[in-house]
Regions:
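Hydrophobic beta-strand-centered segment that forms part of the acyl-chain substrate-binding groove
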Residues: 25-60, 94
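Hydrophobic beta-sheet segments that form the core/acyl-binding groove
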Residues: 46-82
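Residue-level signal for secondary-structure boundary sites
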Residues: 1, 71, 85, 97-99
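C-terminal output/interaction extensions
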Residues: 92-145
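Short alpha-helical scaffold segments that flank and stabilize functional sites
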Residues: 23-28, 80-82
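Catalytic strand-loop segment that frames the active site of acyl-thioester-processing enzymes
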Residues: 1-12, 137-151
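Compact, glycine-rich, soluble single-domain proteins
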Residues: 8-14, 18-26
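A structural microfeature
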Residues: 87-89
Length: 151
């Protein structure tokens, strides 16, 4: 329970900030394959927190790929409160791509599409050139099938 994490202190736990940054990084990497790769967090390489966040604070996460090879993908990330740098984090992600995971789906495409639409990922996510990311066609088809649109 968060209440027992630091009794008598009200702040946003750093572990939850790392979780939010990791989810942002996972979405970035997933988007590169139109969300067909099975991307998982493998390691928190480093993290530095400059100050605590408190209830009502809005943190903005920025994630950038720094290295991608056959072993995994490294990302560098920051958390900002307004113009202030709140945290710096380096994470490593792995892709579950060997034969043991061939029949494993981390998310059902239609439900995942609905979830990331609710999170407004396609409204705030941008490609390196600044253009908005697009909803992958296989997810649109799965979503239409789920909602019985156009049939």
């Amino acid at each position: 329970m968060v209440d027992e994490y630091a009794p008598g202190r009200t702040f946003f736990p750093s572990s939850l900030i790392i979780e939010g940054i990791a989810q942002t990084g996972g979405l970035l990497l997933g988007q590169l394959s139109d969300f067909t790769d099975r991307v998982v967090l493998a390691k928190v390489n480093s993290c530095k927190f400059h100050f605590e966040a408190y209830p009502g604070d809005t943190l903005n996460y920025h994630v950038k790929i720094t290295n991608r090879d056959g072993i995994g993908t490294m990302v560098s990330a920051t958390s900002h409160l307004g113009d202030r740098l709140q945290a710096e984090v380096e994470l490593m992600f792995a892709t579950l791509d060997d034969e043991r995971f061939n029949d494993v789906e981390l998310f059902e495409p239609a439900q995942f599409c609905r979830m990331i639409r609710l999170l407004r990922i396609f409204e705030v996510g941008v490609n390196p050139d600044g253009t908005p990311i697009k909803v992958p066609q296989h997810m649109v088809a799965a979503e239409k099938s789920l909602l019985h649109i156009g049939f």
